[in-house]
């Protein structure tokens, strides 16, 4: 049975066994655009990807299902070579430990996402990046654009445009890279992983 048929079954919850790891050829392939109107499988796939991220961020569910926490997932990581990504970035608690008014800073399934504009300034996460498809720690600054404008379609086939900066920008760029066969460590300077070029914004 194909990956998409398995994952879109009503009873199936995405877990770590569904996620392919580095070295798998699908992670190095350029994914196909989805066509509109979206078919039912593509809509269900997006919903299940978002549900996986929710489950991975819930301590009880994550422990029960043995999930690694994630804020983004791309269809190619499920061995489905389509331009579909899900992003779920929680808002932090306030300084007094109270929950945020809005649970998520960004919650979206994006179909055919692409970067249509970006800043001249580069940015990187100070602690580096990780990936659900990479089981090892890869140290170094992953150089990305500080700000991006994203164009994508939602599950209703409506075209959307989103301006992102900081952490949200980094997360979405990471997931879009997966649809282009790019891994995060490709963007680390191999000879000098912690090089700070002039103007680089380090995001804590």
From Swiss-Prot:
One GO term in the molecular function aspect is: metal ion binding
Keywords, in A-Z order: Hydrolase, Iron, Metal-binding, Protein biosynthesis
Give me any GO biological process, just one.
co-translational protein modification
- Which cofactors must be present for this protein to function? Fe(2+)
E.C. numbers: 3.5.1.88
How does the cofactor bind to this protein, according to its record?
A: Binds 1 Fe(2+) ion.
Q: Which Pfam families match?
A: Pep_deformylase
Where is Fe cation bound in this sequence? 131, 174, 178
Q: Which domain of life is it from?
A: Bacteria
What family does the database annotate?
Belongs to the polypeptide deformylase family.
Q: Which NCBIfam families match?
A: pept_deformyl
**What is this protein for, i.e. what is its function?**
Removes the formyl group from the N-terminal Met of newly synthesized proteins. Requires at least a dipeptide for an efficient rate of reaction. N-terminal L-methionine is a prerequisite for activity but the enzyme has broad specificity at other positions.
Name of the protein in question:
Peptide deformylase
- Species in which this protein is naturally found: Streptococcus mutans serotype c (strain ATCC 700610 / UA159)
């Amino acid at each position: 049975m194909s990956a998409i048929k398995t994952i879109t079954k009503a009873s199936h919850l995405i877990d770590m066994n569904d996620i392919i790891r580095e070295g798998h050829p699908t992670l190095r392939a350029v994914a196909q655009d989805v066509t509109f109107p979206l078919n039912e499988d593509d809509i269900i796939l997006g919903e299940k990807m978002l549900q996986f991220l929710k489950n991975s961020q819930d301590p009880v569910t994550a422990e029960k299902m043995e999930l690694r926490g994630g804020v983004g997932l791309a269809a190619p990581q499920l061995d489905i070579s389509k331009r579909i990504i899900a992003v779920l970035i929680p808002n932090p608690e306030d300084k007094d430990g109270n929950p945020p008014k809005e649970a998520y800073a960004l919650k979206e399934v994006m179909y055919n996402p692409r970067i249509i504009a970006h800043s001249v300034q580069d940015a990187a996460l100070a602690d580096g990046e990780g990936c659900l498809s990479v089981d090892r720690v890869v140290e170094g600054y992953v150089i990305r654009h500080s700000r991006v404008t994203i164009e994508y379609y939602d599950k209703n086939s409506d075209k959307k445009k989103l301006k992102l900066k900081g952490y949200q920008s980094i997360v979405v760029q990471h997931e879009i890279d997966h649809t282009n066969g790019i891994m995060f460590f490709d963007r680390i300077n191999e000879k000098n992983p912690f090089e700070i070029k002039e103007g680089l914004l380090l995001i804590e």
